[in-house]
Design a protein with these regions (language model features):
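Short amphipathic alpha-helix that is part of the acyltransferase structural core
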Residues: 1-24, 108-145
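Conserved donor-binding loop and adjoining core beta-sheet/short helix segment
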Residues: 2, 17-78, 170-187, 193
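Cytosolic beta-strand hydrophobic patch enriched in CBS
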Residues: 40-44, 161-165, 217
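Acyl-donor-binding surface of acyltransferase catalytic domains
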Residues: 48-49, 54-116, 218, 240-244
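Conserved acetyl-CoA-binding loop-helix of GNAT-fold acetyltransferases
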Residues: 68-77, 191, 197-211, 227, ...
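Conserved active-site alpha-helix within GNAT-family acetyltransferase domains
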Residues: 90-99, 202, 222-240
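A mid-sequence, solvent-exposed acidic-amphipathic segment
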Residues: 130-185, 190
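Recognition helices and adjacent regulatory flanks at domain boundaries
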Residues: 164-165, 177, 200-211, 218-221
C-alpha cells in the first residue's frame, strides 16, 4: 500500500539512512505536509515501511528498503505522474535515465594545515544569495524560484550556503542543499577559473565537512572529480540514478 502522509510522525519508523533519506526528511522538515507542491508518501508491506518518497513540484526523491514492491511503485508513478525520479538503481521503471556516483565522508580535517599559505582567506556562512546565485551561474534555473526555496530551507536549518572569500571576493562556493539530523548533502561546489588548483575548493569542502557532525554526501558524474573528493576523504559508496 502506498499512502500520502499528513503527519510527519508517520515516517518515524523509517530507519534507513542514505542520501535519499536525507533529501526527503530535510524537505519534510522544511515544508511539512501542508503544501500542495511538496507531498510525501510511504509504501507499507506487512506493517513495515519499505519505501518513502517526496514530490517537489513533481520531481521525486525515492528511498528504498528491503522488500519494497517495485511494481506497485511503477503503477503509482503511472497514475500520479512524475518529472524526474532520483533513486537507487534497484528501482526499475521503463524510462530513460542518467547515472552517477554517490560519495560520502565523515572525515574531519585540520584546517590550519590545509590553509597554510592561503593569505587573506575567510569563509562566509551567510553570503548574500544574489551574489551566490550569480557566482554559481545556474543553468535553466531562474533566480526567484531558487531564492524562495533555498532561503526557506536556510531559515529552517535544512540548508546552508558557504563562500570562501579572498580580499572580499568570492573565489569558491558551495551549498548544503539538504541537512537532516547530523547528515547533509553537498551541492554546487564551484571555484572561479582563475583560482582553481590553488587549494581553495578543497579547503571549503573540508570546512563544510567539519561543520557537519555526521556524514556528508555528494552526487557526482561518473567520470568527473573522483580524485578531488577522494583526496578530501570521500569514498565511493554507490550509484545514483535519475529517471526522466
Amino acid at each position: 500500500m502506498i499512502e500520502q502522509i499528513e503527519d510527519s510522525s508517520l515516517f518515524d519508523d523509517w530507519k534507513k539512512n542514505d542520501i535519499y533519506t536525507v533529501r526527503i526528511l530535510a524537505l519534510l522538515k522544511s515544508y511539512g505536509t501542508a503544501y500542495r507542491f511538496a507531498t510525501f508518501y510511504r509504501q507499507i508491506i506487512d506493517g513495515k515501511i519499505t519505501a518513502i518518497l517526496s514530490k517537489l513540484d513533481n520531481d521525486v526523491t525515492l528511498a528504498l528498503d528491503d522488500g519494497f514492491d517495485n511494481e506497485e511503485l511503477v503503477r503509482f508513478f503511472c497514475i500520479t505522474g512524475h518529472g524526474s525520479i532520483l533513486c537507487d538503481p534497484a528501482f526499475q521503471i521503463g524510462a530513460k535515465f542518467e547515472e552517477g556516483v554517490i560519495m560520502s565522508s565523515e572525515v574531519k580535517r585540520d584546517l590550519n594545515v590545509m590553509g597554510a599559505g592561503m593569505i587573506g582567506i575567510s569563509v562566509d556562512e551567510y553570503p548574500k544569495l544574489m551574489d551566490l546565485y550569480n557566482f554559481i551561474d545556474y543553468e535553466n534555473q531562474d533566480f526567484k524560484s531558487w531564492y524562495v526555496d533555498i532561503s526557506h530551507r536556510v531559515r529552517h536549518n535544512t540548508a546552508k550556503a558557504y563562500t570562501l572569500n579572498v580580499a572580499g571576493n568570492i573565489v569558491t562556493s558551495s551549498i548544503l542543499s539538504s541537512i537532516y539530523d547530523d547528515d547533509a548533502v553537498l551541492t554546487a561546489v564551484r571555484t572561479g577559473e582563475e583560482y582553481r588548483r590553488m587549494g581553495y575548493g578543497g579547503y571549503l569542502v573540508s570546512y563544510i565537512c567539519n561543520d557537519i557532525k555526521g556524514r556528508v554526501y555528494i552526487m557526482r558524474d561518473a567520470e568527473l572529480n573522483e580524485h578531488f573528493y577522494t583526496d578530501l576523504g570521500f569514498k565511493n559508496i554507490g550509484i545514483w540514478r535519475m529517471y526522466r
